[in-house]
C-alpha cells in the first residue's frame, strides 16, 4: 500500500464530503445557530449528547461555549451529558443504557433549553430517548445526523432542526459534524457579541 496515496485519498474524500454537505446544510446551520442564540438570550442552556466520537463532539461543543471559542467573551451555559461517569454508569446499571441521557434531561432540562443530539447513523437508542425526553421538557432539538437520518429524523418536530450530512462513511460524517460544531460556535459568538471582521 502506498501510504502517501492513501492519505491523499482520505483528504480528498473529506474535502468532497464537506463540499457536498455545504450545498445542503448551510441554511440548517444558520437556523440552528439562531435557535441556540435565542435560547441563550432567554437565559436557557444547551445540553448535548452522543456516543463514542459523537460523545467527544458533544463535549467539544459544550467546552467551546463554557470556556471560549476564538475570542474572549463571557462563558455560555452548556452541559455535555456524556461526562459524568458515576451518573452514566448508575443509570445504565440501575435502569438501561438507553436512558443514560434521557434521565439527565428530565432532571436538568427546562422549557426553552436546546438539546444538541449527535449520531452519525441517527439510530442511537439513547439519543432517540434523549430527544423524546427533550420534547417532554418542552425543549427544542438540533439533531446532527448522517446517512438517512435514522430514527432521530422521524422523531423531530417542525420546530426542531436536523443537520443531516449526506454521506454514508462514518469517519466522513464525523469530520463534517466537527466542522458544523465550529460553525455553530462561530455564529453564536458573532450573533451575541458582534462580528470581529
From Swiss-Prot:
CDD domains: SIS_GmhA. Keywords: Carbohydrate metabolism, Cytoplasm, Isomerase, Metal-binding, Zinc. Substrate binds at residues 51-53, 64, 93-94, 119-121, 124, 174. GO terms for molecular function: carbohydrate derivative binding; D-sedoheptulose 7-phosphate isomerase activity; zinc ion binding. It is found in: Cytoplasm. Zn(2+) binds at residues 60, 64, 174, 182. One of its GO terms (biological process) is carbohydrate metabolic process. InterPro entries: GmhA/DiaA, Phosphoheptose_Isoase, SIS_dom, SIS_dom_sf, SIS_GmhA/DiaA_subfam. It catalyses: 2 D-sedoheptulose 7-phosphate = D-glycero-alpha-D-manno-heptose 7-phosphate + D-glycero-beta-D-manno-heptose 7-phosphate. Binds 1 zinc ion per subunit. Pathway: Carbohydrate biosynthesis; D-glycero-D-manno-heptose 7-phosphate biosynthesis; D-glycero-alpha-D-manno-heptose 7-phosphate and D-glycero-beta-D-manno-heptose 7-phosphate from sedoheptulose 7-phosphate: step 1/1. GO terms for cellular component: cytoplasm. It is an enzyme of class 5 (isomerase). It holds the Pfam family SIS_2. It comes from the Bacteria. Its cofactor is Zn(2+). Residues 36-197 form the SIS domain. The reaction produces a racemic mixture of D-glycero-alpha-D-manno-heptose 7-phosphate and D-glycero-beta-D-manno-heptose 7-phosphate. Homotetramer. PANTHER family: DNAA INITIATOR-ASSOCIATING PROTEIN DIAA, SEDOHEPTULOSE 7-PHOSPHATE ISOMERASE / DNAA INITIATOR-ASSOCIATING FACTOR FOR REPLICATION INITIATION. Belongs to the SIS family. GmhA subfamily. Catalyzes the isomerization of sedoheptulose 7-phosphate in D-glycero-D-manno-heptose 7-phosphate. This is Phosphoheptose isomerase. The lineage of its organism: Bacteria, Pseudomonadati, Pseudomonadota, Gammaproteobacteria, Pseudomonadales. The gene is gmhA.
Amino acid at each position: 500500500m502506498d501510504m502517501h496515496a492513501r492519505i491523499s485519498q482520505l483528504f480528498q474524500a473529506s474535502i468532497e464530503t464537506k463540499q457536498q454537505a455545504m450545498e445542503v446544510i448551510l441554511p440548517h446551520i444558520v437556523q440552528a445557530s439562531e435557535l441556540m442564540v435565542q435560547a441563550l438570550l432567554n437565559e436557557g442552556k444547551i445540553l448535548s449528547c452522543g456516543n463514542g466520537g459523537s460523545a467527544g463532539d458533544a463535549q467539544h461543543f459544550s467546552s467551546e461555549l463554557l470556556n471560549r471559542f476564538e475570542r474572549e467573551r463571557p462563558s455560555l451555559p452548556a452541559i455535555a451529558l456524556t461526562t459524568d461517569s458515576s451518573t452514566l454508569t448508575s443509570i445504565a446499571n440501575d435502569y438501561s443504557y438507553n436512558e443514560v441521557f434521557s434521565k439527565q434531561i428530565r432532571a436538568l432540562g427546562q422549557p426553552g433549553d436546546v438539546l444538541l443530539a449527535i449520531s452519525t447513523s441517527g439510530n442511537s437508542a439513547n439519543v432517540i430517548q434523549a430527544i423524546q425526553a427533550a420534547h417532554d421538557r418542552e425543549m427544542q432539538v438540533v439533531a446532527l445526523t448522517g446517512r438517512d437520518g435514522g430514527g432521530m429524523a422521524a422523531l423531530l418536530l417542525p420546530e426542531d432542526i436536523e443537520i443531516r450530512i449526506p454521506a454514508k462513511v462514518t469517519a466522513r460524517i464525523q469530520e463534517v459534524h466537527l466542522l458544523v460544531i465550529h460553525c455553530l460556535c462561530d455564529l453564536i459568538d458573532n450573533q451575541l457579541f458582534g462580528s470581529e471582521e
